[in-house]
């Protein structure tokens, strides 16, 4: 099916023809035949790299150019950024694109000027809770990775958000994009959608198992040269000899980094002079963005053509690795499975070194088939590779047979709603009532009838859980009941708008009411004791130190559980460890020191700080509404967590472009406020932070004079404190 034959405006047809896309892939053509461009709901359950995004673009462009508005929902911020960059190409068609992924208590009415809005499912839910007006103008909703409804973490939010959008805009087109799942027909029926189900791929995918020097596929075998003792490295080298690149999936961050390091000597020998020059530039950028030991290891790997990729890295480092790989200079990325979750980063060969993953409940367990299919689907770059290969590793012939049966010849599992627990449902019951989607228990059950859970299990299974949620919300003062009417209180409405678990809000309110003296530690631990906080993992070497700290600071905790209650006490110690990380962060400890002390990654520090800042913001707002102590202290800590600095630097940090390191330099040199800077000589400030930053500072505080360039040697003479920039500077 040719692009020129589609029912689309001429400028859209020209856009794609000029982009080198003259015709559709077979699954795309099937989607058009089933009503994609006629506003019909559609579920496309097709493999990775088979053109799902183009389906979304065609539906959105058809609707937007007819005066509509499109919402593109993604599961991850990184994926939102990737799609946003892609959709900005539509500016030549006069289309405006916006993105929104954070600040859960904002309406973001300004986003409404855009024609296409990219948002995470959580942000979409928060926009609905805050009654953002432009949400009612949405004419097409694209849900990327809709199979994540099966996720216990993100699934319930996505499911309820879809139900709300469909109730608010009953004539809105829903386009759901999914990996191939076992019960795609059931998911399509729930969405009242036509189903496009296909295994077609633009490049052939050869799935197989490597054993005893041979790559076994269904219908052929390939002998692999063995220049090293590591089978996976030999597979990588085999791919590089043929001009391809490799993704290697590992089960843990430690293994991920270890393999990238191990492969450096072998991969480096394959690099051209141009490769080495470009890789050196990427490595230098990595070191400019971070001073941690992990960044140093990553830069060393990148110089040799390898890299690792996991959530412990900051976003700038991950993006540098991804860009280097897309441009063909990084030959190998060793990654945790997070890379398989949506990011467009295909490779000639995908190697899955371990198909087992540790579970705290049941030890090492085989990964689901769906997860294997997601990783395998990254093999084969459309229009670049003649084929793709997905390789599992076996240590015995019996394991080879097991892997063929378990993964290669198996279909993906069915997906199941995870909405039917009190923890999952509590926040959505409150928001549904607060937003007026339901005003009685009967209306609430009618609304929940539209969820995937009710479609799979019937509403009967939800009734008992809903009663438990309603009882909790009434007891905590978030709901009132007048006869049959369910009414959200001011407390309940605020909790819903702030996008916090009602249990977290109840714990914060209780903690502020009952606390004696409110110290930094008291408030940080209160935040870390909520279910919305992501806690640090306890290592064996942590127990003694943190237990000693608890004993020395017991009066600063609202409650210390008995050490004889092993599960509760260990959970408490994790809360304390997370609090101590945040304590080091706001006291300006170097990020590398924090990483080493807590056994974490730089990216984890920023993620933990982001979540803590949000929950501390909630604490501030709740304290003000309920007239509880701690509002002022929480507001100050919220700002300090944002910047990772002491209270004396807050005035300086309000100037854009000054991070905590530069602010501390200025403060140490006697510039303790914007007023001090207003009276400073440009040369003195430039000696501390550089001429470009100095000029930006003076522009913001109302001074326009130019700052002269000074040499590196002069700057070193004028400021012995000057050091290499880190991500915190920015």
UniProtKB/Swiss-Prot annotation:
Residues 721-730 have a biased composition (Polar residues). The keyword Transmembrane helix does not apply. Keywords: ATP-binding, DNA damage, DNA repair, DNA-binding, Helicase, Hydrolase, Isomerase, Nucleotide-binding. ATP binds at residues 28, 46-53. GO terms for molecular function: 3'-5' DNA helicase activity; ATP binding; ATP hydrolysis activity; DNA binding. It catalyses: Couples ATP hydrolysis with the unwinding of duplex DNA by translocating in the 3'-5' direction; ATP + H2O = ADP + phosphate + H(+). CDD domains: DEXHc_archSki2 (cd18028), SF2_C_Ski2 (cd18795). The keyword Nucleotide-binding applies. Residues 707-730 are annotated as: Disordered. One of its GO terms (biological process) is DNA repair. PANTHER family: ATP-DEPENDENT DNA HELICASE HEL308 (PTHR47961:SF10), DNA POLYMERASE THETA, PUTATIVE (AFU_ORTHOLOGUE AFUA_1G05260)-RELATED (PTHR47961). Monomer. DNA-dependent ATPase and 3'-5' DNA helicase that may be involved in repair of stalled replication forks. This is ATP-dependent DNA helicase Hel308. It comes from Methanosarcina acetivorans (strain ATCC 35395 / DSM 2834 / JCM 12185 / C2A). The gene is hel308.
């Amino acid at each position: 099916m040719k692009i020129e034959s589609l029912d689309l405006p001429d400028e859209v047809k020209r856009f794609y023809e000029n982009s080198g896309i003259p015709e559709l892939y077979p699954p795309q053509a099937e989607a058009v035949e089933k009503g994609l461009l006629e506003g019909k709901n559609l579920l496309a359950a097709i493999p990775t790299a088979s053109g799902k995004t183009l389906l979304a673009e065609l539906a959105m462009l058809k609707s937007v150019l007819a005066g509509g508005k499109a919402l593109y929902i993604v599961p991850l911020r990184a994926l939102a950024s990737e799609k946003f960059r892609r959709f900005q190409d539509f500016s030549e068609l006069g289309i405006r694109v916006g993105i929104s992924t954070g600040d859960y208590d904002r309406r973001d009415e300004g986003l409404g000027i855009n024609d296409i809005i990219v948002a995470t499912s959580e942000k979409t839910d928060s926009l609905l809770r805050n009654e953002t007006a432009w949400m009612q103008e949405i004419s097409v909703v694209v849900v990327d990775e809709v199979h994540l409804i099966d996720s216990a973490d993100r699934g319930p939010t996505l499911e309820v958000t879809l139900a709300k959008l469909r109730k608010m805009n009953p004539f809105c087109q829903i386009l759901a994009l999914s990996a191939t799942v076992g019960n795609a027909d059931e998911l399509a029926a729930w969405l009242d959608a036509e189903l496009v189900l296909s295994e077609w791929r633009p490049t052939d995918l050869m799935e197989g198992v490597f054993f005893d020097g041979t790559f076994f596929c269904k219908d052929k075998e390939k002998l692999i040269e063995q220049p090293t003792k590591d089978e996976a490295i030999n597979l990588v080298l085999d791919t590089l000899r043929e001009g391809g690149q490799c993704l290697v999936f590992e089960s843990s961050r430690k293994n991920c980094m270890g393999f990238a390091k191990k492969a450096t000597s072998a991969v480096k020998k394959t690099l051209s002079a141009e490769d080495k020059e470009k890789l050196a530039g990427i490595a230098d950028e990595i070191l400019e963005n971070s001073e941690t030991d992990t960044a140093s290891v990553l830069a060393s790997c990148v110089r040799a053509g390898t890299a690792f990729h996991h959530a412990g890295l900051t976003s700038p480092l991950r993006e540098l690795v991804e860009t280097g790989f897309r441009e063909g200079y990084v030959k190998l990325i060793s990654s945790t499975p997070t890379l398989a979750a949506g990011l467009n980063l295909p490779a000639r060969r995908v190697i899955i070194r371990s198909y087992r993953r540790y579970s705290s409940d049941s030890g090492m367990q085989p990964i689901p088939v769906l997860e294997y299919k997601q990783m395998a689907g990254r093999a084969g770059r459309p229009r670049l590779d003649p084929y793709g290969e997905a390789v599992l590793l076996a240590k015995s012939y019996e394991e080879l047979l097991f892997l063929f049966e378990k993964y290669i010849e198996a279909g993906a599992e069915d997906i199941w709603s995870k909405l039917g627990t009190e923890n999952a449902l509590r926040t959505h019951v409150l928001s549904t009532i607060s937003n007026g989607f339901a005003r009685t228990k009967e209306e609430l059950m009618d609304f929940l009838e539209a969820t995937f859970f009710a479609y799979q299990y019937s509403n009967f299974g939800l009734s008992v859980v809903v009663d438990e949620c309603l009882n909790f919300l009434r007891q905590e003062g978030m709901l009132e009941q007048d006869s049959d009417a369910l009414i959200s209180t001011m407390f309940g409405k605020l909790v819903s708008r702030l996008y916090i678990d009602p249990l977290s809000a109840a714990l914060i309110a209780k903690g502020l009411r009952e606390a004696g003296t409110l110290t930094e530690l008291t408030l940080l631990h209160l935040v870390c004791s909520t279910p919305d906080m992501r806690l640090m993992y306890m290592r064996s070497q942590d127990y003694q130190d943190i237990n000693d700290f608890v004993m020395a600071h017991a009066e600063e905790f609202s409650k210390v559980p008995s050490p004889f209650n092993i599960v509760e006490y260990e959970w408490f110690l994790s809360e304390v460890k997370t609090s101590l990380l945040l304590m080091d962060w706001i006291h300006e400890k170097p990020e590398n020191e924090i990483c080493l002390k807590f056994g974490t990654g730089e990216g984890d520090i920023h993620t933990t700080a982001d979540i803590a800042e949000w929950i501390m913001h909630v604490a501030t707002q709740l304290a003000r509404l309920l007239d509880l102590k701690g509002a002022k202290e929480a507001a100050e800590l919220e700002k300090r967590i944002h910047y990772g600095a002491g209270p004396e630097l807050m005035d300086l940090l309000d100037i854009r472009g000054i991070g905590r390191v530069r602010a501390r330099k200025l403060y140490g040199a006697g510039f303790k406020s914007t007023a001090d800077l207003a009276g400073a000589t440009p040369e003195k400030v430039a000696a501390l932070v550089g001429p470009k930053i100095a000029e930006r500072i003076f522009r913001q505080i109302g001074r326009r004079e130019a700052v002269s360039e000074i040499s590196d040697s002069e700057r070193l003479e004028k400021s012995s404190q000057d050091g290499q920039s880190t991500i915190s500077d920015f």
